[in-house]
């Protein structure tokens, strides 16, 4: 069971809504992966009516909506988008995204921290997308963010946990949930994140662009479950030396 702010989730796999060939395929994949929290970009939905092709099936499915501020380049733009989302969707949950460079889509640490502090003061449950910077993640936690969402690699790159060393530090020092976001390309990446101690992962591109998104969604669900179970089972420690699993000489001594 995963708890973030005032909500609990059975699934440790969060998903997005971008890049799917159709809203029907999107919903089939979401159901297949068992995600209970789904992020959506405010610029992609019709906020004036809930019969939007993306929004309507999500509301009907009863998943927790996590609107994001993707496209915002400054703290001011992100705060403006956050208020639009709260008014239109009736939720104070927000994935804070501020990335000024459209080529790399890397989060702006200064603007993110500035916006996060103000949004928390304004009553939002803030989950910030951020770089894998242990100092920044601790500062975001200190200003009241409900979780932190450090990247594994650039958005949509499918490179995996390129920031593993920093993620391990973030996880070790965090007192709020850590959700690894961005760059997860295959189910084994998700399993590794849960094994190392992450509370959840957010996966979008890897599922949406797969040849078979629904089966890929199932694969991610199983990988996340496996990674979490492995961590809870207490993996053995790593060693530079070999350790025999069976006696090497006992049978010789017994035959003498």
Curated annotation (Swiss-Prot):
One GO process term, biological-process aspect: thiamine diphosphate biosynthetic process
Active site per the UniProt annotation: 95 (schiff-base intermediate with dxp)
Pathway: Cofactor biosynthesis; thiamine diphosphate biosynthesis
Keywords on record: Cytoplasm, Schiff base, Thiamine biosynthesis, Transferase
GO terms under cellular component: cytoplasm
Annotated catalysed reactions: [ThiS sulfur-carrier protein]-C-terminal-Gly-aminoethanethioate + 2-iminoacetate + 1-deoxy-D-xylulose 5-phosphate = [ThiS sulfur-carrier protein]-C-terminal Gly-Gly + 2-[(2R,5Z)-2-carboxy-4-methylthiazol-5(2H)-ylidene]ethyl phosphate + 2 H2O + H(+)
Pfam families for this protein: ThiG
Alphabetical list of InterPro entries matching this protein: Aldolase_TIM, Thiazole_synthase_ThiG, ThiG
EC code(s) of this entry: 2.8.1.10
GO molecular function, one term: thiazole synthase activity
Protein family according to the UniProt entry: Belongs to the ThiG family.
Function, in words: Catalyzes the rearrangement of 1-deoxy-D-xylulose 5-phosphate (DXP) to produce the thiazole phosphate moiety of thiamine. Sulfur is provided by the thiocarboxylate moiety of the carrier protein ThiS. In vitro, sulfur can be provided by H(2)S.
Database matches in HAMAP family: ThiG
Assembly and oligomerization: Homotetramer. Forms heterodimers with either ThiH or ThiS.
Designated name of the protein: Thiazole synthase
